[in-house]
């Protein structure tokens, strides 16, 4: 088995209940937050166990001299290795565990695992500062859900989008026409988000 044989399974969207949302910025009153989607390292491990349980490994080493707890991760899947750096806020040894999880997720993105989360639109949502979480979780679009969670219409739409990636017309004018209609359709589904100007962005907010 080669990496190319399992690429689509690795890249498949995660179940909606495994996707969490973290704030990237707040309004001045901290009643609204700009949310980014992410999954935790355990979801990444579960995906690797499901696709290639005996053919992946993760190694890490602490990066000395860094300003914040930093870990260099090395993820190997079916003989292919990817490396990346994970960071966490200052703290005790628990911060290094968080940095290791961050490194693993960033390495996994290089294999396509969870990469689609970067394509999700950023959303402003009501924020419960006492509970340190959004009052209501955003809805994931159809294309960001696994097959069994999609409506029949949504599944057909995703299939058509996938086909469009490989069957674009060669004529440049036709490509522009396709792009115009696609942009209009996506704009009606996900209008440009509006929200207060962020006053205190959270460092390191990223989806992965």
From Swiss-Prot:
Recorded superkingdom: Bacteria
DNA repair is among the record's keywords: yes
InterPro entries named in the record: Rad52_fam
Knockout consequences: Cells lacking this gene show a normal growth rate, do not exhibit a decrease in the efficiency of natural transformation, but display a reduced capacity to survive ionizing radiation when exposed at doses superior to 2.5 kGy and exhibit increased sensitivity to mitomycin C.
SS bond list: none
Induction comment from the UniProt entry of this chain: Induced to high levels following extreme ionizing radiation exposure. Also highly induced in response to desiccation stress.
Record has Iron as a keyword: no
GO biological process, any: cellular response to desiccation
Single annotated GO MF: DNA binding
One Pfam family hit: Rad52_Rad22
Keywords per UniProt: DNA damage, DNA repair, DNA-binding, Stress response
Role played: ssDNA-binding protein that contributes to the ionizing radiation resistance of D.radiodurans. Plays a role in DNA repair and genome reconstitution, in a RecA-independent process, since DdrA is essential for recovery from severe genomic fragmentation as a result of exposure to severe levels of ionizing radiation in an environment lacking nutrients. In vitro, binds to the 3'-ends of single-stranded DNA, protecting them from nuclease degradation. Thus, DdrA is part of a DNA end-protection system that helps to preserve genome integrity following irradiation or desiccation.
Family to which this protein belongs: Belongs to the RAD52 family.
Quaternary structure and partners: Homooligomer composed of 8 to 10 subunits; probably arranged in a ring-structure.
Name the UniProt record assigns to this protein: Single-stranded DNA-binding protein DdrA
């Amino acid at each position: 088995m080669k990496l190319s044989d399992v690429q689509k399974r690795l890249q498949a969207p995660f179940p909606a209940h495994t996707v969490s949302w973290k704030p990237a910025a707040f309004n001045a009153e901290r009643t609204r937050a700009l949310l980014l989607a992410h999954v935790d390292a355990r979801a990444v491990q579960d995906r690797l166990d499901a696709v290639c349980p005996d053919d992946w490994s993760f190694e890490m080493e602490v990066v000395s001299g860094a300003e914040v707890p930093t870990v260099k991760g090395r993820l190997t899947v079916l003989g292919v290795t990817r490396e990346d750096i994970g960071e966490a806020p200052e703290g005790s040894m628990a911060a290094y565990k968080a940095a290791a999880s961050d490194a693993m997720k960033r390495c996994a993105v290089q294999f396509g695992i969870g990469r689609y989360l970067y394509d999700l639109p950023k959303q402003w949502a009501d924020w419960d500062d006492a509970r340190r979480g959004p009052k209501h979780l955003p809805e994931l679009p159809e294309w960001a859900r696994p097959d069994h969670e999609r409506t029949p219409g949504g599944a057909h739409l995703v299939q058509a989008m996938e086909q469009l990636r490989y069957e674009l017309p060669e004529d440049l004018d036709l490509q522009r026409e396709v792009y115009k209609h696609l942009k209009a359709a996506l704009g009606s589904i996900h209008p440009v988000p509006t929200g207060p100007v962020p006053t205190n962005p959270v460092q390191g907010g990223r989806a992965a």
